[in-house]
């Protein structure tokens, strides 16, 4: 197995991102959140966009999963959806993650995976939402399949907590590492994801988004004043 992939086995990856409207949506903040995650024991960082990735690279000596997002959409691919988006982040991550959903069809994702491999020596991670998409991405040459988009396409259901069934099904059907991502909220969730066959687990806002965490505590407490 690739040395980077081996280093991620049964380890935690931290996704460090913030949307517009979040007070942490500042490249300085993002880079230092990534550094804090690294100091806490993260095995890798997932981050978005040229500016943030460049700043993180200066502070963090860990593998980076690089993405280049367009505006989020339930109907159109938006995570590094085309070769232009991928080229913009070449050299900024050991792994480039791409939207490998069937939107509009599997051919788009297959061509994108192949073209990145032709042009760059990075690993390619396929962010998918269904078992069918994961199998197709692995066949197309993806080095990793991730459950990132389960519940975030118009044809998948958003589960409460991680999609453990999808993680298990993928780990049984594909010959590449399965990285579990999406709605991991507790250490118990992480253990369940690894037990279901995940190679490693990505956690984002439950570690790096203070606004989200605050809202979660208030919303789920029976005694706090709303």
Would you name each region that the model predicts?
Residues 1-84, 91, 122-124, 132-141, ...:
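Conserved N-terminal beta1-alpha1 strand-loop-helix module at the mouth
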Residues 10-14, 32-33, 64-66, 92-94, ...:
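A short alpha-helix capping/helix-coil boundary motif
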Residues 17-19, 68-72, 92-105, 144-157, ...:
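Glycine-rich phosphate-binding active-site loops on the catalytic face of alpha/beta enzymes
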Residues 37, 56, 137, 145, ...:
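Conserved, mostly hydrophobic/aromatic
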Residues 41, 60-64, 91-95, 118-121, ...:
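Glycine-enriched alpha-helix->loop->beta-strand junction motifs that scaffold or abut catalytic
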Residues 47-48, 67, 99, 127, ...:
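Structural motif
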